[in-house]
Amino acid sequence: MNKTMKPANPMKVITGPDTRWSYANVWEPKSINGGTPKYSVSLIIPKSDTKTLAKIKTAIEAAYKEGEGKLKGNGKSVPALSAIKTPLRDGDTERPDDPAYAGCYFINANANSAPGIVDADRNPILTRSEVYSGVYGRASITFYAFNSSGNRGIACGLNNLQKVRDGEPLGGKASAEDDFATDEDDDFLD
């Protein structure tokens, strides 16, 4: 190992390229329920991406071990990992009416500072319309323990994003390109 390299952070994960981004608030921070404005994205991970899911579960366990003191708080013992909130959620049970989440897990990741956003060749993406809810890409995320206002658990921080490919926009709105893709004149007055 190169002596100048930092040891790998066991709580950091790079998701696979089939991760889909939803609720992508990555250009401007957004306040949720009156809270502090944050950059955020919901990462939709196919259940078939067992490699990414295994890395996430390992990172959640590492965050739990690293944060035992914080999770214990003023209590006498650390709550079991199975008894606290974790960010990996099942789309089939928590979002049964949303086809984008079918057969997937999802994680809501957020950050106080803007994530770096690059394309498949690692060039910065500066055009906001290139990144939208529905694109596919990799995400650099870090898991950490929290204990605030009586809520304890593991949360997910958003570091950086890499767009891999376009996808069907989520949210039901067709793009202008799709709306006007036909050469036909749909004027009903003809």
Regions found by a protein language model. Give the residues of each.
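OB-fold ssDNA-binding interfaces and closely related basic DNA-contact patches used
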Residues: M1-F106
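Residues in well-ordered beta-strands of folded domains
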Residues: S42-I44, N108-N110, Q162-V164
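Structured, beta-strand-rich domain cores
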Residues: G69-G150
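Compact mixed alphabeta submodule
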Residues: V118, N123-D190
